[in-house]
From Swiss-Prot:
The keyword Membrane applies. Belongs to the UbiA prenyltransferase family. Protoheme IX farnesyltransferase subfamily. It holds the Pfam family UbiA. Gene3D superfamilies: UbiA prenyltransferase (1.10.357.140). It comes from the Bacteria. This is Protoheme IX farnesyltransferase. One of its GO terms (cellular component) is plasma membrane. Pathway: Porphyrin-containing compound metabolism; heme O biosynthesis; heme O from protoheme: step 1/1. The chain crosses the membrane at residues 32-52, 53-73, 93-113, 120-140, 153-173, 180-200, 226-246, 249-269, 295-315. The gene is ctaB. It catalyses: heme b + (2E,6E)-farnesyl diphosphate + H2O = Fe(II)-heme o + diphosphate. It comes from Brucella suis (strain ATCC 23445 / NCTC 10510). Coiled coil: none annotated.
Amino acid sequence: MSLVEKNTASEDAFALSEATARDYLVLLKPRVMSLVVFTGLVGLVLAPGHMNPVLAVISILCIAVGAGASGALNMWYDADIDAVMKRTRKRPIPAGIIAPNQVLAFGLTLSAFSVMTLGLMVNWLAAALLAFTIFFYAVIYTMWLKRSTPQNIVIGGAAGAFPPMIGWAAATGEITWDSLVLFMIIFLWTPPHFWALSLFTTNDYEAARIPMMPNVKGELSTRRQALFYAVLMAPVGVLPWVMGFAGMFYGVVSTLLGLAFVYYAWRLWAADSQLQMLAAARKLFRFSLLYLAGIFAVLLFEALTFKLLAAFGVF
């Protein structure tokens, strides 16, 4: 059975209701999109030189649309497991609001539009990175890794790490070591973030037969690996300051937040009861969001401040 047949064969089973603009917005996974747009914006602003403001806005919009397209394609393919999991069963396809083939067409149209617009209006390197990101998330992660290996988040996390590289490439037309460091921060952040989530949503993933780390390797192994990636991530998070494309303020904030991240991961690893483990997993999950938002916010603040002062001739 082809991929299209997989999700259209049972389409008659959906008692479709009239879809609204809000329902199509849900397909774009707006929460995920907001993080993608934010990190892409940081990459664009942090990049050296000055970019035409109109092209900058176009770049960010294309990154947002591309991210939304990935989300729609993910929901199209994952409609069967979304119907099983508590936190996803109200999404438009399992809820019977939008037909699978309409979601597929929506996702493919947005994908083509975002990539072609970015290429024609900005540059083709950024467009190629955006196209690869959409492909990696929708095909490599969603259709293959997610259902086949407990390392799905580790490898698949690359999809969420590309946006700052896309923003950087849009501004400079280049891939540099600096942009690769931004990629690595998010790449190493992803496993402990999602494994913390999976530790207190294990039943959901098990019901959907998704091989998340706790379901396959057990909770102790998951906690150990979350700590391992946190320890790897913390020093990488300081590299923007070490390499000279972030300031001292960022260096201090990233160091403190990195140490706190390791502490929360250690608390999770050291938990000696199920109740303590679940509490520690929730704390790590919440703090991981604060960590990523915090360090990228500081990067953005420093970059905007420096460019504003430079515009007034201070530097």
